[in-house]
Amino acid sequence: MQRLALIALASIPCLMSEADASTLQDTIATDLSFIEQLVTKTLDSLGSVPAANPLYPYAGGDSGTWTTTSPSDGAHGWTSGFFPGELWLLYQATRSTAWRDAAQAWTTPLASQASSVDRIDPTDIGFIIGTSFGNAYRLTGDTAYKNVINAAGKSLAGLYNPTVGAVRSWTFSPYVPPNFAVIIDSMMTLGPLQWGASNGGMSTWAGYAATHAQTVITNLVRPNGSTFEVAVFDRTTGALKSQGTFAGYSDSSTWARGQAWALYGFVQAYQTLDNPAFLTTAEDVANYFVGQLVADHTWIPPWDFDAPGTQPVDTSAAAIAADGLVMLSTVAGTSALETMYLDDAENILGRSAATILITLIRKASPC
């Protein structure tokens, strides 16, 4: 569950960029200097960015040092954009040139990943480029960053299969041809495709992204708002072959992080593609996520909502969901729903932040 600890920390300043909620912004402002101290220690532990083959932090364990990964690594490289994304968000929060310079230094080496479609999950391109170059362009307006985002969009568009109506995800066995895997995580990784369609890329990309989202709704979102992690199709006929999980407890269970990806991803899809069905799905997924926490009398999810007994909690899923709920509050349509989603986000984030802080103290975190 620590593999995404960096996301949980990054999502705290991310809330500042995503929401107009003054209560959350006040909380973030109070804690900002503490966050800066943690990330400064991370930078110090990593040293300067090497000219070639830089390694990016993705996990911190009991040893008190960061575990790092190459961006091209199949198992962990998909996380490599999160750290520069975190640096860009700190620049946004402080306008410190030191954070900007660090963000630029850690972002630039990732440019080649925009075309890395030979990954075990080629949609990871969206994770890597969206969080790093996406924030870089948003905060600087530098067209060099925009060009990389659109290169990622082009790569994702090349993975689209019109017969299935989706962008291909996993490429490892048993998901090799004739199988065609679509995963719930993909709702978070199609940002370059969605955004690029109206920002210098091909206009057809919007249709690809919208059809993909509808395919996910039909085949990965259950009627009660819970989600499968993966749906497998026949790449030639488009027929659905199976629904299940890889990272979750069982094929019929709900992997908490996947549920969080869906929540955030469908809000993002609604914001960029303006399809009411995506908002409805985001609300259904959010209601299921929060409902499970309320039923369990807690505001931090287990790694899988259906795993039996006492299970490890997943603060990364909590942080992703909290961010998604704040985004959802901005498009909810009524003041009552806005308040409800913000309250849910605040409850989740407050409990998760406390859990993360305790973990940092107990394990002498490398932060």
Q: For each of these PLM feature ranges, what is it?
A:
Residues 1-18:
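Fungal secretory targeting signals
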Residues 20-367:
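Glycan-recognition and catalytic cores of secretory/periplasmic carbohydrate-active enzymes
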